[in-house]
Amino acid sequence: MSNDFLFTSESVSEGHPDKVADQISDAVLDAILAQDKYARVAAETLCNTGLVVLAGEITTTANVDYIQVARETIKRIGYDNTEYGIDYKGCAVLVAYDKQSPDIAQGVDRASDDYLNQGAGDQGLMFGYACDETPELMPFPIYYSHRLVERQSLLRRDGRLPWLRPDAKSQVTVRYVDGRPHSVDTVVLSTQHAPDISQAQIREAVIEEIIKPVLPAEMLKETKYLVNPTGRFVIGGPQGDCGLTGRKIIVDTYGGASPHGGGAFSGKDPSKVDRSAAYAARYVAKNVVAAGLARQCQVQVSYAIGVARPINVTVYTEGTGKISDEKIAALVQEHFDLRPKGIVQMLDLLRPIYEKTAAYGHFGREEPEFSWEATDKAAILRAAAGL
């Protein structure tokens, strides 16, 4: 890729049907972890018009009212009226959970290469990424895509724009010059709305009340605004589209700025490295950038089911490193325990903290529960690198 280019990322609101599913899955996970922190959970959710289906594999001693958890999550999101696409009071909730396969459990409970440590819950590859485009060390396009739909939700909830509805999508296209964000080329924002509001009113309010307060003014030079470009967005949420857990994995991570290993996060307990190792890889990458070892850092880790130690830990800094990528990778392996049990202890992951992650991005948010966003290893890495 040349140093001058356009790059686009998107986000969706908490009311998007796939995000409704993600939040229900993580609400189920949290409810279980609150009672049984060693539970094995793989909770999947489907939501459609008037229907929620809960399925997957759960092994736990917890006693959870899964139907009530689903209804409360839908209520919190704001779907309390059938006109919005689904109503928490009247929707049907079907529960079809099974237990974790004993074949999987035996490999996770006792690692084949280290009997003192938990084996990975599956094979797979995971990526973490950080860059210095924003103070949160996230790529500019995905960071601001999240903030746009987050503000849409805020204005809906506090009543400033009472005609807003829960479902919304954003997309930010950024012009890069010399490899750095230079200006916002295009913003797309589509929001579900009440039927009696005009397109002109929607456009003005979205631009003035949502977009301009969020995006840095100096980046809005010749920006194109596309607001509800179909002209109407009344039918939304699970009525407009069927929602499924795990269908927004690029929204959840880096907006396409980094590769993705393919494994979704929501509904999975920390023994699933799809989730825990991706969080750890973000933690590593963010600390590398915070330490000043590189302006950009991509970390890949991979695992085999039942084996504790990662097969590889690979660092790529895209030519921005102060020391070689190989030396950074060696420092990472020295200062971060990337075995599944080590990750859980390092990041304190056996907590009911996951529903909050399921909308507006798992990364780049300074939430107190998000231990993987800490930069507490930066000084250690910098000293070890001799900088």
UniProtKB/Swiss-Prot annotation:
Would the keyword Nucleotide-binding turn up in this protein's UniProt record?
A: yes
According to the UniProt record, one GO cellular component term is:
cytoplasm
Listed pathway(s)? Amino-acid biosynthesis; S-adenosyl-L-methionine biosynthesis; S-adenosyl-L-methionine from L-methionine: step 1/1
Q: Which domain of life is it from?
A: Bacteria
Predominant location: cytoplasm
EC number(s) in its UniProt entry?
A: 2.5.1.6
According to its UniProt record, which cofactors does this protein need? Mg(2+); K(+)
Q: Which Gene3D superfamilies match?
A: 3.30.300.10
One Pfam entry for this protein is S-AdoMet_synt_C
The residues the record assigns to binding Mg(2+) are 18
Q: Give the binding site residues for K(+).
A: 44
Q: Where in the cell is it found?
A: Cytoplasm
Q: Which GO terms describe its molecular function?
A: ATP binding; magnesium ion binding; methionine adenosyltransferase activity
User: Where in this protein does the record put region Flexible loop?
Assistant: 100-110
Residues that, per the record, bind ATP: 16, 167-169, 232-233, 241, 247-248, 264, 268
Which residues are recorded as binding L-methionine?
Answer: 57, 100, 241, 272
Query: Which note does the record give on the cofactor?
Result: Binds 2 divalent ions per subunit. Binds 1 potassium ion per subunit.
Q: Quick check: keyword Glycoprotein in the entry?
A: no
The reactions it catalyses are: L-methionine + ATP + H2O = S-adenosyl-L-methionine + phosphate + diphosphate
Q: Name one GO biological process term.
A: one-carbon metabolic process
Q: What class of enzyme is it?
A: transferase
> Which key words are in the record?
ATP-binding, Cytoplasm, Magnesium, Metal-binding, Nucleotide-binding, One-carbon metabolism, Potassium, Transferase
Q: How does it assemble?
A: Homotetramer; dimer of dimers.
Function of the molecule? Catalyzes the formation of S-adenosylmethionine (AdoMet) from methionine and ATP. The overall synthetic reaction is composed of two sequential steps, AdoMet formation and the subsequent tripolyphosphate hydrolysis which occurs prior to release of AdoMet from the enzyme.
Report the sequence similarity comment from the record.
Answer: Belongs to the AdoMet synthase family.
Name the chain's protein. Answer: S-adenosylmethionine synthase
Organism, as annotated: Cupriavidus metallidurans (strain ATCC 43123 / DSM 2839 / NBRC 102507 / CH34)
